[in-house]
Amino acid sequence: MDSSKKLLFPDQILSSRRNILTRFGLGIAASFLLLTLLSLTSSSFNVPFVSPLLQGLKSSNLNNSSSVKQVNEKPEVVNLTDKVPDVKVPSFVVPDAGSKNTTLSEESKVPSFDSGQRSGETVKNSSLAEEGNGSVADDQNTLEANATTSVGNSSSLVSDLGGRFVVPANTSKENGSVTEDRSRGSYEDCDIYDGSWVRADDETMPYYPPGSCPYIDRDFNCHANGRPDDAYVKWRWQPNGCDIPRLNGTDFLEKLRGKKLVFVGDSINRNMWESLICILRHSLKDKKRVYEISGRREFKKKGFYAFRFEDYNCTVDFVGSPFFVRESSFKGVNGTTLETLRLDMMDKTTSMYRDADILIFNTGHWWTHDKTKLGENYYQEGNVVYPRLKVLEAYKRALITWAKWVDKNIDRSQTHIVFRGYSVTHFRGGPWNSGGQCHKETEPIFNTSYLAKYPSKMKALEYILRDTMKTPVIYMNISRLTDFRKDGHPSIYRMVYRTEKEKREAVSHQDCSHWCLPGVPDTWNQLLYVSLLKAGLASKW
């Protein structure tokens, strides 16, 4: 009996253990079920007291996939317009991480948009450009080749097939061509000498038909001398930042009514003077009312020439004075007489033009000749003749003498002073007297790398105009715009040749300094007209 009872005790214990385990298992299952329900509930309602636990579970479960998440996740796009609502912001495309073709260069500097102002930094290899108006330009207006910049007109340069073509700030590009938007800036605030030559395919050029003007010197009358092509008269000058008006001959004459306009300088200024005479004459119905007061039709000899426009009671004159200063002579110690140039005295011709209403000066062409270039026993100041003086230094001293004379003798309230810059020559293969040529040139230069360096004489002139003179001067900086026009010179077409020998001799002595008429000087006169219009905004001329 006892033994049977003893045998039953373990069964009782096991039975009780089974009960306990069963109850414990049910408790664990209930707890787990409760936690599961709470987990689902907390994900929807953010129950605070279970968050730490769930967060730990999540972190342990996602640990191995976090690096993949970082690679595939797109970076945040910052909306710049929220910070600067008044500034036009370009559309930035933020690439996926790891993209090879759309990453920004490390050298790129994004303009600062703080307070609506930009830092002025340049964005390299991007489409940002400064327009000077507080906005970011469209990429079509930021075309720039070889890091060239255009001064003062907010335009860019684009190099295409070796040519220099100007894309103004308001343009559109269609099929690789440039289409002008006519909403350009005003010429009143524009650098009219910064631009390019454009083909004029209509009837606007030239200003007068070739062969129609009887007052063109034979040396400039390329059409009459047999030049076979006429493309050189079909180019017009287009400033980068604005459009300029054509020279209105009758309007010009109306503004000259009762006045005297005088060109003073060398034969290049005579070239320009003859051009203006022909343009103004062509605008009149009765051309017999225009005449040279002495009846002359050739003007090569140094002197004074005046054309009278009878209906307007005005004259347009030319005074030959290639140096401004006086050509003189000096007796040496041994009795020899030296031809000299008095750098400290004005030419005697000043009495012919000091009363003019508009004066257009130029000098430079004769300073390249052998006598002036060598400068040996030629330049004189006072009683001193310099054994040797560099031509650029002599040129500066002559200009200072001219500037002092203008300041002392010209009434700035009555007279406009204009200085036309140096006209570039195009002799290839040698200088003018040693076989230099420009024959068979039929197009302008388009590749700017072929242009000459800016003339040092013009740098000297600009310094004197800016820092020495008191009288305001309208400076016509035509050096660069003429440098493009290698096609515009008379070359061998300076006369009608009667024999083959004359033709052969002409080839070795070509004129690549002066200009055919009609031709490039017509554009100078258009720019003169526009310059005077600009000056007339402040004072009536």
From Swiss-Prot:
Membrane topology reported for the UniProt record: Single-pass type II membrane protein
Segments traversing the membrane: 20-42
Pfam families: PC-Esterase, PMR5N
Cystine residue pairs: none
GO molecular function: O-acetyltransferase activity
Biased composition (Polar residues): 114-128
Subcellular location: Membrane
Source species, domain of life: Eukaryota
Record motif GDS motif, residues: 265-267
Chain spans, region Disordered: 91-141
UniProt motif (DCXHWCLPGXXDXWN motif) ranges: 511-525
Expression tissues: Not expressed in trichomes.
GO cellular component, one term: membrane
Family label: Belongs to the PC-esterase family. TBL subfamily.
Other comment: Contains 2 motifs that are conserved in esterases, but it is unlikely that this protein belongs to the catalytically active pectin esterases.
Described purpose of this protein according to its UniProt entry: May act as a bridging protein that binds pectin and other cell wall polysaccharides. Probably involved in maintaining esterification of pectins. May be involved in the specific O-acetylation of cell wall polymers.
Name by which UniProt lists this protein: Protein trichome birefringence-like 2
The encoding gene: TBL2
